[in-house]
Amino acid sequence: TRVMPGAKWFSGAKLNYAHHALRHLEDDAEVLVGISQSRARQSLSGADLRAEVSRVRSGLISLGVGHGDRVAGYLPNVCEAVIAFLATASLGAIWTSCAPEFGVGAVLDRFGQVEPKVLFVVDGYRYGRHDVDRSDEIGRLRAGLPTVTSMVVVRHLALARSTESSSPDVIEWSELGNGESDELFIDDVEFDHPLYILYSSGTTGLPKPIVHGHGNITLEHLKVLALHSDMGPSDRFMWFTTTG
């Protein structure tokens, strides 16, 4: 009798989530909007988003990221997080994230298990009227993740740069990929190739990494957005949540 564990779905089929997320976007249409307490409204057109994904993809390649490597984001729910995720996916690398309000121990419990090669971080965030500087937490995260070879800093609060920013393996978001974008290339991967890693709550021990693949998430998002939510190309979607 055949059993489910170990079953393969759509063997031989290849795709990439990033390709399907980007392929129908109109160049001049507003496709990604970021609204934050700490900076002006961000707006990216289809052409802008593809260019930014291409730039960050090139930057990741220059940092040695390739097929199967893990890339982690200690980022809020901002445009840079979406861009970094899509750029990571386009390479066949694997994304994972935690929200910056997580404490250092909670983040290390998660990222430490998946051994990321590159870490995206934010300098801080605003909660109500208060700026929350995460510089100390970033330093402790870096020290606790020996597999990280490069760190990319997103300046969300425009805080003064810490002394660690002078390290050659710490890169500013704006400088990633030399600030330039080329034509966007996307690598096809197997249907079940890992796309991103989420985590269980950790209530019964360490949080357990949960791996989702390109094929199943492409189908799941199509189902939820197009069928369950009846969304089309001109509709807008906001999910009020964090990256955790």
Describe every region a protein language model picked out.
Residues 90-175:
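Structural core segment of the AMP-binding/adenylate-forming
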Residues 18-45, 155-162, 168:
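AMP-dependent adenylate-forming
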Residues 19-23, 61, 79-99, 106-108, ...:
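Hydrophobic alpha-helical segments in the ANL/AMP-binding
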Residues 32-86, 103-108, 169-178, 212-215:
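Conserved AMP-binding/adenylate-forming core of the ANL superfamily
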Residues 75-78, 99-101, 241-244:
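Conserved AMP-binding
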Residues 28-30, 152-153, 164-199, 206, ...:
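Conserved pre-ATP/AMP-binding loop-to-beta segment of ANL
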Residues 38-40, 197-209, 225:
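Conserved adenylation A10 loop of the ANL superfamily
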Residues 3-35, 51-56, 70, 80:
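AMP-binding/adenylate-forming domain of the ANL superfamily
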